[in-house]
């Protein structure tokens, strides 16, 4: 993935964190980022994540729920936002390979999450990916078997 898209994920994480903790309107958050004039990000992708995650929160939380070890509202807010971004990408952006989604989420968790938060994020999103990207998982496993 492009560095611009990685930066968009980082900005979306920050915006979604504000939205989750303070209930701030995503339009206001978007305006804040425009005013800050953050350069080098894929602004359209930032907006897609910033708006798409709240719009589909129920569906995303339902998708994540079976794999969480606690209710979603008890998950660390940073990891929660990362999990929701990852679930959104897995569900809504099938053109992005699941490995890219997982790697980007892990990097966000390493950078912004708790000490071992990246392991938690990886474990949850890996299970979500197996469920929602089953065909992609099977074809990857088949390719690995054929290579050995």
Curated annotation (Swiss-Prot):
Keyword annotations of the record: RNA-binding, Transcription, Transcription antitermination, Transcription regulation
UniProt cross-references to InterPro entries, sorted A to Z: NusB-like_sf, NusB_fam, NusB_RsmB_TIM44
UniProt-recorded Gene Ontology molecular function terms: RNA binding
GO cellular component: cytosol
SUPFAM superfamilies the UniProt entry points to: NusB-like
One BP term from GO: transcription antitermination
Gene3D superfamilies: NusB-like
NCBIfam families per UniProt: nusB
Its job: Involved in transcription antitermination. Required for transcription of ribosomal RNA (rRNA) genes. Binds specifically to the boxA antiterminator sequence of the ribosomal RNA (rrn) operons.
Family: Belongs to the NusB family.
Protein name in UniProt: Transcription antitermination protein NusB
Organism of this sequence: Nitrosococcus oceani (strain ATCC 19707 / BCRC 17464 / JCM 30415 / NCIMB 11848 / C-107)
Lineage, opening ranks: Bacteria, Pseudomonadati, Pseudomonadota, Gammaproteobacteria, Chromatiales
